[in-house]
Regions:
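Single conserved hydrophobic/aromatic residue that forms the stacking wall/gate
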Residues: 1-11
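Conserved N-terminal catalytic core of the sugar/cofactor nucleotidyltransferase
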Residues: 8, 43-105, 186-191, 195
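Residue-level signal for inorganic ion chemistry
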Residues: 17, 43, 98, 111-112, ...
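Residues at the starts of beta-strands that form the adenosine-phosphate
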Residues: 55-57, 134-135, 214
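Conserved alpha/beta core of the MobA/IspD/sugar-nucleotide pyrophosphorylase nucleotidyltransferase superfamily
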Residues: 165-247
Length: 247
């Protein structure tokens, strides 16, 4: 794989990279995962990094972008097997498709392509936690005080900040755990409809809700930002530029 570390061993690892979002808050005609960042599309930053540590990469993108991504990836000199599949209307449905496409592995790393500034240390910590606990979800402590408020803006409570974490990706799970979680979720959707699934915002929530497994967090990074607004693109350019200068 071309990368030597404590996480690089006989464990078979596959990555599911989610690049199917519309990115409406970016206010651009092009979806955020295809915007130019340091000379390449946003999603390609994650593909290149996970290629150093994954045996297989499943890129989940919008149906109309599958061919574009395939053509782009064919020009890349990647070590991992890479497949591109069409995603769905909801993130968790796209993630479920990605997990289904992953096979014959010990660990599945699920990552949002919009987090183009993720670094190898964050990925390795996620893997290390998953090997021990079955899950490793990148997270960082809150820096700010958080308030719970009603629709009128009246404060209802102030949670203890020390117990709260901002959740990121990658989210790494043992293959059997994440597959069982999504199988259970899929059964509920097929029998009761998609509304019965509730509001699912990440893969850890699927494991929390649809299995009896405990979810464990791993140390993320404040640089591992999610590209959501134009300001985030500026910040990401600064982060990646600084790393380039350090090399």
């Amino acid at each position: 794989q071309g990368y030597s570390s404590a996480a690089s061993d006989v464990y078979k690892r596959q990555a599911v990279i989610l690049a199917a979002g519309s990115g409406r808050r970016m206010n651009t005609p092009v979806a955020k995962q295809f915007l130019d960042l340091m000379g390449i599309p946003v999603f390609l930053h994650s593909v290149r990094l996970f290629d150093k540590i994954a045996d297989k990469i499943v890129l989940v993108t919008s149906p109309d972008a599958v061919e574009y991504c395939q053509n782009l990836l064919e020009k890349e000199e990647l070590c991992a097997e890479v497949i591109v599949i069409a995603g769905k209307s909801e993130r968790f449905l796209s993630s479920m498709e990605g997990v289904r496409a992953a096979s014959d592995c010990d660990l599945i790393m699920i990552h949002d392509a919009a987090r183009a500034c993720v670094d190898m240390e964050v990925i390795e910590r996620s893997i290390a936690s998953a090997r021990i606990h079955g899950s490793g979800v990148a997270a960082v402590p809150l820096k700010d005080t958080v308030k719970v408020a009603d629709q009128n803006g009246m404060v209802l409570s102030t949670p203890d900040r020390s117990t709260l974490r901002i959740i990121q990706t990658p989210q790494t799970f043992k293959h059997d755990i994440i597959c069982a979680a999504y199988d259970h979720l899929n059964h509920i959707i097929e029998t009761k409809g998609i509304k019965a699934a509730g509001s699912i915002t990440d893969d850890a929530m699927v494991v929390e809700t649809f299995t009896n497994q405990k979810v464990y967090l791993s140390e993320g990074s404040y640089e591992n930002i999610k590209l959501t607004t134009p300001e985030d693109m500026t910040a990401a350019h600064g982060i990646l530029s600084a790393r380039t200068r350090e090399l």
